[in-house]
A protein has these predicted regions:
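Right-handed beta-helix
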Residues: 2-23, 48-120
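Short, basic/aromatic beta-hairpin or loop at an interaction surface
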Residues: 28-39
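Beta-strand/loop nucleic-acid-binding surfaces
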Residues: 37-50
Length: 120
């Protein structure tokens, strides 16, 4: 039996997490991790909804036979303990240390009414 097993390589276990690129910006999404996978569910923290942009670097987790998209690579350099929420076009909310809330964007709206700036 020992001789019959010589030359055989054991199967490699499949990775449980991979970095890939979003190919379809929707939910379910498409993602490239060496081959394209479609119908990949998109997950985020509770109360937070997002969709990856096409070409964005994403984290793909294996969930049984399926995969799920769990997030994108972080950009920027927040201080330890800070929380940044960034959107397209430079809009951002930054929860900083000391209780400071920093809001950046071209307009600030409350219940649809423009408080500052101009809505395009």
């Amino acid at each position: 039996m020992w001789l019959s097993k010589q030359g055989r390589t054991p199967p490699r276990p499949e990775e449980t997490a991979r970095v890939g690129r979003a190919t379809l910006p929707d939910d379910p999404a498409g993602v490239w991790t060496g081959s394209e996978r479609r119908d990949v569910a998109v997950f985020g923290p509770g109360g937070y909804t997002w969709r990856p942009a096409a070409g964005e670097e994403v984290l793909v987790l294996k969930a049984g036979e399926e995969a799920c998209l769990a997030g994108v690579r972080c950009t920027g350099v927040p201080e330890p303990g800070e929380v940044w929420i960034t959107g397209p076009g430079g809009s951002a909310i930054r929860l900083k240390s000391g209780g400071v809330v920093d809001i950046t964007g071209t307009a600030l709206c409350f219940n649809g009414a423009v408080l500052a700036g101009e809505v395009e």
